[in-house]
Regions:
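Juxtamembrane intracellular "pre-TM" segments in multi-pass secondary transporters
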Residues: 1-5, 181-216, 404
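Short amphipathic helix-loop junctions that connect adjacent transmembrane helices
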Residues: 27-41, 230-246
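Conserved MFS/SLC helix-loop-helix module at the cytosolic interface between two early adjacent transmembrane helices
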Residues: 55-94
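Helix-to-loop junctions at the C-terminal end of transmembrane segments
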Residues: 58-69, 261-274, 359
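Cytoplasmic helix-loop-helix junction between adjacent transmembrane helices
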Residues: 100-139
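A membrane-interface helix-boundary motif in multi-pass transporters
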Residues: 154-167, 357-380
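Multi-pass alpha-helical transporter architecture, strongest
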Residues: 173-179, 376-404
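C-terminal transmembrane helical hairpin of 12-TM major facilitator-type secondary transporters
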Residues: 276-320
Length: 404
């Protein structure tokens, strides 16, 4: 049986490979969809449909992982992701792109399940640091994923990144099948089988006020952030003439900053300042950076705004996940985090669809105003996030025991 450190490393690698596949398509998808005649509104839906389907799938997969174990859910999720990307690669119509995104979304419970896996094997006081390692895997995925996606699209065409992402997901599946042990013991699964349905049972097994607050905060953050990601590639293309390859390198820079903060600094920062204070600071960074982005008058200023976005997200995301995890009983970790990820998925659907509509509105006003309304709307969501962060508890009284 691998040690806890080894298991964390395997989860880190699993999420890293998953996020490389996810990051590969971010700078490419708008341009790939335009080849098939997609409008800005349809591009927004192409980003958003993945998350809309994931919204329904995540809590179900979280409950399945509580009852049958984390490992099989992670394995099936990554196989579904591989199938979705391959369909997007071979498809030559906009409809096939949507089919691939829907299949990928149905398989999109791996992140919440991976977070539950980490919660299974870590003590409550270690959660934010462990979630920071997940955040670092996200960051590394965003270093390599967009860069690989932009480069392969420039060299081999827009369908090539889809095959790369599908291949990486298959590698991920092999890694999980061959190496990753189960973290959720059978006796805990029996408790989950006897427990209540997700609603209202969940609220008997969490500290309701902090959990609801952190989920609402997470929803608002993701909605604002996904508005930005939905328009960013087209924004830098029209404003600064950045192509898919250049945009990929920008996302790689954001990922590098995230890796440095979440991989090497978040644990010490949490001990010194506390989770709720760090979350508040992160929300402030994100809000100001998103508001500033459409006002930038040169590449250097735009890059600085990207740095602010990266810092804010790196402080906010792992601390919110840590608070949510510690507010739930041990045998309900999968469902609590799955529901939180599901609300994030709903926000990731709303964000890009809203971004596409706002982008079309700005286009009617000319390139000079391009993407101003989407970025201001994103900043508005982060203002709400900031206000909600002020209501997060400084600490939780109840600290559920870990499962291992």
């Amino acid at each position: 049986m691998p040690s806890k450190r080894t298991s964390l490393l395997i989860i880190f690698l699993t999420i890293f490979i998953n996020m490389v596949g996810f990051g590969v398509v971010i700078p490419v998808l708008p341009f790939y969809a335009e080849r098939f005649g997609a409008s800005t509104w349809e591009i927004g839906w192409l980003f958003g449909i993945f998350s809309l389907v994931q919204f329904f799938a995540s809590p179900i997969l979280g409950q399945v992982s509580d009852r049958f174990g984390r490992r099989p859910v992670l394995l099936l999720s990554t196989l579904g992701t591989a199938a979705g990307f391959i369909i997007m690669g071979i498809g030559q119509t906009l409809t096939m792109l949507f089919v691939g995104r829907i299949i990928d979304g149905l398989s999109g419970g791996s992140i919440g399940t991976a977070q539950a896996y980490v919660a299974d094997i870590t003590a409550p006081e270690e959660r934010s640091r462990a979630m920071g390692l997940i955040g670092a895997a996200f960051g590394l995925g965003f270093i390599f994923g967009p860069a690989i996606g932009g480069w392969t699209a420039a060299q081999f065409g827009y369908s090539a990144p889809m095959y790369v992402a599908g291949g990486l997901a298959l590698i991920n599946s092999v890694l999980i099948f061959c190496i990753l042990p189960e973290s959720h013991p059978k006796e805990k699964r029996q408790l989950s089988k006897k427990s209540e349905p997700l609603f209202p049972g969940l609220f008997k097994h969490v500290e309701v006020k902090p959990y609801v607050t952190v989920v609402a905060t997470y929803f608002s953050m993701i909605a604002g952030f996904s508005i930005m990601t939905g328009v960013f590639a087209l924004f830098v293309f029209h404003r600064y003439q950045f192509n898919a390859e250049s945009t990929g390198y920008l996302f790689a820079m954001i990922g590098l900053i995230g890796t440095i903060i979440q991989g090497g600094m978040i644990g010490r920062l949490v001990k010194k300042y506390g989770e709720s204070r760090l979350a508040t600071i992160g929300a402030l960074f994100l809000m100001l950076s998103l508001f500033w982005m459409p006002l930038t008058a040169g590449v250097a200023a735009m890059v600085l705004a990207c740095c602010g976005i990266a810092i804010g997200n790196s402080l906010l995301s792992p601390t919110l996940t840590g608070i949510a995890s510690r507010s739930a009983d041990a045998e309900w970790q999968g469902r609590a985090l799955g529901l939180m990820q599901s609300m994030g998925s709903l926000a990731r659907w709303i964000g890009p669809v809203l971004a596409g509509w706002l982008l079309a509105y700005d286009l009617d006003k000319g390139i000079a105003a391009y993407a101003r309304t989407p970025f201001y709307t994103a900043a508005g969501f982060l203002l709400l996030t900031f206000i909600l962060c002020l209501r997060l508890p400084a600490r939780l009284v109840k600290k559920p025991e870990p499962l291992a």
